[in-house]
From Swiss-Prot:
Swiss-Prot/TrEMBL domain comment: Has the structural arrangement of an alpha-helix connected to antiparallel beta-sheets by disulfide bonds (CS-alpha/beta).
Gene Ontology terms: biological process: defense response
InterPro entries named in the record: LCN-type_CS_alpha_beta_dom (IPR044062), Scorpion_toxin-like (IPR003614), Scorpion_toxin-like_sf (IPR036574), Scorpion_toxinL (IPR018218), Scorpion_toxinL/defensin (IPR002061)
Record keywords: Disulfide bond, Ion channel impairing toxin, Neurotoxin, Secreted, Signal, Toxin, Voltage-gated sodium channel impairing toxin
Gene Ontology MF terms in the entry: sodium channel inhibitor activity; toxin activity
Function description: Alpha toxins bind voltage-independently at site-3 of sodium channels (Nav) and inhibit the inactivation of the activated channels, thereby blocking neuronal transmission.
Protein's recorded name: Toxin BmKaTx10
GO cellular component, as recorded: extracellular region
Subcellular location, record wording: Secreted
């Protein structure tokens, strides 16, 4: 039984686990991508590995792109100020 658990654990480590989340895709300095059209956001999100994206009109950060199932390696907007350069 212990052998089966160890083999399963080793396989899990070797294959890795890709996790995803939903959120506003972020520019550098914690700024959300502004939008007017769903097509812009869908293209942006899917090019960054998300399942789909759309323009969230009048959302928490104004008109901004919301991505569904965005990979963890792509930054999302987090609470706090946007600091454009």
């Amino acid at each position: 039984m212990n052998y089966l658990v160890m083999v399963s654990f080793a396989l899990l480590l070797m294959t890795g686990v890709e996790s995803v989340r939903d959120g506003y895709i972020a520019l550098p300095h914690n700024c959300a991508y502004g939008c007017l059209l769903n097509e812009f956001c869908n293209d942006l999100c899917t090019k960054n590995g998300a399942k789909i994206g759309y323009c969230n009109i009048q959302g928490k950060y104004g008109n901004a792109c919301w991505c569904i199932e965005l990979p963890d390696n792509v930054p999302i907007r987090v609470p706090g100020r946007c600091h454009p350069s």
